[in-house]
Amino acid sequence: FLASGATSIILEKFDEEMAFSSIEKYKVTHSQWVPTMFVRFLKEDPSLRTQYDLSSHQVAIHAAAPCPVAVKEQMIDWWGPILHEYYAGTEYNGITMINSQEWLDHKGSVGRPLFGSLHILDDDGVELPIGEVGGVYFGGETATTFEYHNDEEKTKSAMTDQGYSSLGDVGYLD
């Protein structure tokens, strides 16, 4: 967003009321959150929800931790279908994205890959069928071009013979 000339508002310390005040004051259109912030918003006095004009808010992106289904449902009920979730790592070996409507149809999902492919493998590197839990692996160009800084062994351990890479997370495809 910065490259496009957008203004960034960065709070020195997260505070629920300051976040709402900033959205109103600066007419924030896009924001980035973590699920813990949503939990804190929802624990606030419900009257706080109507004190601020959040109508400028068009896109609320969240990531960095799993978001409990009940929390995300409440946030969509409150803010509307502006929530977008992504799953990725700083290694940038892959990324998934899901919008509010897709998520409501597949609660708990983190979406589809934006590029490349997504695979669920067992401990032997065998692809698992839909619904079975295993290691999450990305395939494609970014999956094979990332590396851990000054750690060739760690980089090798994240790769498979098929050219897939993993952050070490587990999941399943639906």
Stretches found by the model and what they are:
Residues 2-8, 20, 25-33, 42-106, ...:
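Gly/Ser/Thr-rich phosphate-binding loop
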Residues 15, 122-124, 151, 155:
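Acidic/polar helix N-cap motif
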Residues 112-115, 165:
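Short coil-to-beta-strand transition motifs
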Residues 102-109, 157-159:
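Short, P/G- and charge-enriched loop/turn segments at secondary-structure junctions
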Residues 15, 37-38, 67:
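Alpha-helix capping/helix-boundary segments
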Residues 37, 89, 144-145:
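Methionine-biased hydrophobic packing positions in alpha-helices, especially
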Residues 11-12:
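Short beta->alpha connector loops at strand-helix junctions that form conserved
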Residues 129-131, 137-174:
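Conserved ATP-binding/catalytic segment of the ANL
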